[in-house]
């Protein structure tokens, strides 16, 4: 890296925190404690590049290292240079392997904070993911003066309109809300040359695709589109052919499930499930767990039962008031509670590092749902456990999901080795 190019100009108004000495800037970083947990090849099988090799702005590197990132993961190593070169990307990588940073880092690098226009639009399918992504973006860009805004349905439209009177450089949003703002001429996307779609398979489902296609009409002709997902159904491929220019394809999905997640099933009758769950709670070394149910009603009933058994428990689902959902998400992430009962609202992209156990209280019908659920444990190459409670009616779904994902879900042993999932 050319050290002359990287030196910041010495100007009298430069705040003292701007580090000018090339040899000295790393020694002044405020690094978090090093995570010494063992990691799997999902994040360690790289070509050996460092973040320093990516020719990023000094202030962005400071944010990256202070966030605790040490070296780029495989998806980051592949995607960041291509995104910085301005190519469209269609990237497929497992959940929990660093996808978010692989698009946030180039987004921040390419943003010019001196221009008071929206330059990057990041679309996500859920409100929780929008809040999480915008928070990570703010943390990575904390020295860059880049203004990041999250905008989602379920919150005050008036507040969003007021916020957009001030500069916003990167907008993280759900499709319906940002389309509403664009149609009202409040969110001006005419200078937004980069659109990123996280969880692209969900964004291109029947629910969202018409909104996404309308949004593209508000973008300039010269634009870059980045698609990131763990699964790429036919809808994504046809969207790519229609809207992406000579997209660079990245596929890090030789196998679909995370290497660090051990999967078990237990055959139970419906009426035995609570008893089985109680046994698991007493025997497992749980840091934090997420327990999935197939309906909103069952989420609330199960959370009540778990609390009656004497275990700390929150619940979250799509029919809750947004402010309540935000509070549950925030408190659970901060470790206020050990167990969270959830509907499939909470399967996509949500990153809580302390979750080491996922329990499918109700087994899902589709392999895609299963994949996203178990990806809540074993985040960023760490170890995790997925336990599936299987009724007689679920046996065909179990077989189908094993076949479709090419994975093995084993019968649960009498004792589970703690080294498989506990740091």
From Swiss-Prot:
Biological process (GO), any one? P-body assembly
* Motif residue range(s): Q motif: 49-77
Q: Where is this region: Disordered?
A: 1-46
Annotated ranges, domain Helicase ATP-binding: 80-250
Helicase C-terminal domain location is: 260-420
Annotated residues for binding of ATP: 93-100
Entry EC no(s): 3.6.4.13
Keyword list (alphabetical) reads:
ATP-binding, Cytoplasm, Helicase, Hydrolase, mRNA processing, Nucleotide-binding, Nucleus, RNA-binding
Q: Where is the composition biased (Basic and acidic residues)?
A: 32-41
Superkingdom as given in the UniProt entry? Eukaryota
Bridged cysteine pairs (disulfide): none
Q: Motif DEAD box located where?
A: 198-201
Record InterPro entries: DEAD/DEAH_box_helicase_dom, Helicase_ATP-bd, Helicase_C-like, P-loop_NTPase, RNA-helicase_DEAD-box_CS, RNA_helicase_DEAD_Q_motif
Q: Which reaction does it catalyse?
A: ATP + H2O = ADP + phosphate + H(+)
Q: Which GO terms describe its cellular component?
A: cytoplasmic stress granule; nucleus; P-body
Q: Under the GO molecular function aspect, what terms does this record hold?
A: ATP binding; ATP hydrolysis activity; mRNA binding; RNA helicase activity
Compartments reported by the entry? Cytoplasm, P-body; Cytoplasm; Nucleus
Q: What is known of its domains?
A: The Q motif is unique to and characteristic of the DEAD box family of RNA helicases and controls ATP binding and hydrolysis.
Q: What does this protein's UniProt record list under function?
A: ATP-dependent RNA helicase which may be involved in mRNA turnover.
Protein family according to the UniProt entry:
Belongs to the DEAD box helicase family. DDX6/DHH1 subfamily.
Q: Which PANTHER family match?
A: DEAD-BOX ATP-DEPENDENT RNA HELICASE 50 (PTHR47960)
Q: What is this protein called?
A: Probable ATP-dependent RNA helicase ddx6
């Amino acid at each position: 890296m050319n050290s002359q190019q990287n030196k910041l100009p010495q100007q009298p108004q430069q705040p003292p925190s701007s580090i000018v000495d090339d040899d000295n800037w790393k020694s002044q970083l405020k690094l978090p404690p090093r995570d010494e947990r063992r990691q799997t090849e999902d994040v360690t099988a790289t070509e050996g590049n460092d973040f320093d090799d990516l020719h990023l702005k000094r202030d962005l590197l400071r944010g990256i290292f202070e966030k605790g990132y040490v070296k780029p993961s495989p998806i980051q190593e592949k995607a960041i240079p291509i995104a910085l070169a301005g190519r469209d990307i269609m990237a497929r990588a497992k959940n929990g392997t660093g996808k978010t940073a692989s698009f946030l880092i180039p987004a921040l690098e390419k943003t010019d904070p001196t221009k008071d226009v929206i330059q990057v639009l990041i679309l996500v399918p859920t409100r929780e993911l929008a809040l999480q992504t915008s928070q990570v973006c703010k943390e990575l860009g904390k020295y860059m003066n880049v203004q990041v805004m999250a905008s989602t349905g379920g919150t005050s439209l008036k507040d969003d309109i007021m916020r957009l009177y001030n500069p916003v450089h990167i907008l993280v949003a759900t499709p319906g809300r940002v389309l509403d703002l664009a149609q009202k001429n409040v969110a001006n996307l005419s200078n937004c040359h980069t659109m990123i779609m996280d969880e692209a398979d969900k964004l291109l489902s029947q629910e969202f695709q018409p909104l996404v296609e309308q949004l593209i009409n508000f973008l300039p002709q010269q634009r870059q589109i980045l698609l990131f997902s763990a699964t790429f159904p036919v809808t994504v491929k046809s969207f790519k052919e229609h809207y992406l220019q000579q997209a660079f394809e990245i596929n890090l999905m030789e196998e679909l499930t995370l290497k660090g997640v051990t999967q078990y099933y237990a055959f139970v009758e419906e009426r035995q499930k609570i008893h089985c769950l109680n046994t698991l709670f007493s025997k497992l070394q749980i840091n934090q767990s997420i327990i999935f149910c197939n309906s909103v009603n069952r989420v609330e009933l199960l959370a009540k039962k778990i609390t009656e058994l004497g275990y700390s428990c929150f619940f979250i689902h799509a029919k809750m008031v947004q402010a309540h959902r935000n509070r549950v998400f925030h408190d659970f992430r901060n470790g206020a509670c050990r167990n969270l009962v959830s509907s499939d609202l909470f399967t996509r992209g949500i990153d809580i590092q302390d979750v080491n156990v996922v329990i499918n209280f109700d087994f899902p019908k589709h392999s895609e749902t299963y994949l996203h659920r178990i990806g809540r444990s074993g985040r960023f190459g760490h170890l995790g456990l997925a336990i599936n409670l299987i009724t007689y009616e679920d046996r065909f779904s179990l077989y189908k999901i094993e076949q479709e994902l090419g994975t093995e879900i084993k019968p649960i042993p009498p004792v589970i080795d703690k080294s498989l999932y506990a740091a």
